[in-house]
Amino acid sequence: TIMTDATGHPPITIDHLAVMGNIESGFKAVRVTSFEAHGPELNVNGNALIGAADGRDGLKLEIIAKQSNALSLLAFWPSFLVPEVRSYLGQSIIGGSATEASYRLDLDPSGLRAVIAKDVIPDNAVALDLNFTNGTLQPDKGLPTLKKMEGKVHVTGQKVSIDILGGTIDSGNGRVLTITDGTYRVFDTSLIPTVADINFHFAGAANDFATVLRSDMMRDISTPPLDPEKTSGNVTMAVKIGFPQKPDLKPSDIQVSAEGDLTDLTVENAFGAESLENGVVHVSASPQGLLIKGEGKLAGAPAKFDMHQQNGATTRDANVVMTIDETVREKKGIKTAGLVNGPVTLSFSLKGIGGKRVKGKGELDLTKASINGLIPGWTRPAGKSEKANFSIVISPDESISLDDLIIDDPSIYLKGKAEIGSDGVLRSVNLANLRINATDKVSASLEKAGIGYKISIQGDTLDGRALIKSALSS
């Protein structure tokens, strides 16, 4: 039985067809001593024995092929042999060449009865081996095309094995990832539909990887949120995919696991308006969700981070720790020279990234920094433990609200909130309570006014000596 028209493949051209054989005495068997089928893309020879002869009974078939089109050879794959796999490959293979192939079938009467009943045939009754080159495969209409595939196929009565020796993943627009090795397995052909188990390793550019993730099928599966136009770097990845071989696959039918690394990674607007540079990131994806851990420069500051997305969720959670020193502050236009000396550590945990509103908690660790007049009268030496805690809300326009901002230390006490614009510029600070000296009972506010800020202080008691000293020294 040749491949049906349902596959959409063109007919096979055969220029030479010859069959030689004889009928055994008593009409007990038909022996095909030679079978030849040759054409522009086909070079097949074979023999067969049907019936009782040579001390056996049943069907025995042998086919040898060389330098033939893969689709043409697929037409000689008997329809009763793992039909689901045959149908899947017939619809998925676009092109390729078989350098050599052999097919041997040996069915006794019980095996023939299994074929007639459409039951599973004995595993050792079939041996199909094929070496292929320059193969093109479309695993599913929603997945990227595999091209330039090199490998070998081995099929038995109950198992299918394909070893991939190399190839590429074509993500479109000239973007490709290199497949270094891989396997395709069907461990039990008795299942309906049969289940494919695929493992492969690939390497390439991070922006090409991001393009693959945006294919129709993959973007519905938990994957790293990368924009190809804003991503650069390198990627190496090991991927495992399992799915039933049936028409009209859905994302929920596909089980994907992946483990790999992105290096020298740059992602524009990785966290809001801030970019990640020189990133080294480990990615782990499973049916349970996605975990990303890495380090690099975020907003120009050395940072470590992790991000998690549960399977089926549309938002992600993240933890970030950044070290902000004088150089980073200067680049970001934060004028603290002489007021803050030494690095400060900013850490925050965010929930709901990718949603309409992101919320979280933050902490600013001042332990390694000395302060001299950042707020008039506030001084502290480096090495003394001091932390500021706050809650975070990031709005859709990427403006940031810092609420419940608290610093409680013998050198200062403040409680209030702050607003940072989508451009990263501090817009306002409102302190419901501010104490620099023991007798202070005031509130304070800071508002952006042109190129500077307007400061207001109200309250019952304020030791103004620090303010006057600060004003005279400025």
Q: Where are the model-predicted features located?
A:
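Membrane-proximal interfacial segments on either side of biological membranes
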Residues: T1-L17, I23-V30, L42-I169, G174-D403, ...
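A short, well-structured beta->alpha microelement
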Residues: I407-S411
